[in-house]
């Protein structure tokens, strides 16, 4: 039998795609059933949400229940009208750090509640979240903080 030090390291990388990234929970169910440990989790955009749930070490069913509470029709149906104007008329409605097609106030509230205030410090598996710096367009890797 392989010890943890002998076995290959496993990194689970979850790309972007909004709630479609929840498919990663199905993969986690299989990994859990087969007793395959994940050594690090990486997520981008919607994938960062599920990477975070996995990195916290929550059982898959708890992550599924949290997903069902966070992603409801009232959250996904909210549109940011100003953002549509910013896309259509960028020379009048300038882009800034508040740009987003979906109004994020409700989403942020749901995520704070869903994650129960968890931070990177509480993850059981190392977590890396990739993002884009809006000021210079460069990739940023976040692995600590709130």
What are these regions (language model features)?
Residues 6-109, 141-146:
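Patatin-like phospholipase
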Residues 110-114:
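Helix-loop "lid/cap" segments that line or gate small-molecule binding pockets
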Residues 1-5:
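N-terminal low-complexity/intrinsically disordered extensions
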Residues 119-146:
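Active-site gating loop/helix substructures
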Residues 73-78, 115-126:
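A short alpha-helix-loop-beta-strand transition element characteristic
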């Amino acid at each position: 039998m392989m010890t943890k030090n002998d076995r290959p390291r496993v990194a689970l990388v979850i790309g972007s795609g909004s709630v479609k990234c929840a498919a990663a929970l199905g993969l986690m169910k299989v990994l859990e059933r087969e007793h395959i440990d994940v050594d690090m989790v990486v997520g981008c955009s919607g994938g960062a949400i599920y990477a975070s749930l996995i990195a916290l070490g929550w059982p898959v069913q708890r992550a599924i229940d949290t997903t069902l509470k966070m992603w409801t029709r009232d959250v996904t149906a909210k549109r940011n009208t100003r953002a549509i104007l910013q896309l259509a008329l960028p020379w009048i409605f300038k882009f800034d750090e508040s740009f987003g097609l979906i109004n994020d106030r409700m989403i942020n509230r749901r995520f704070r509640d869903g994650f129960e205030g968890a931070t990177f410090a509480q993850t059981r598996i190392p977590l890396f979240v990739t993002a884009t710096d809006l000021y210079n367009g460069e990739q940023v890797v976040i692995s600590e903080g709130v």
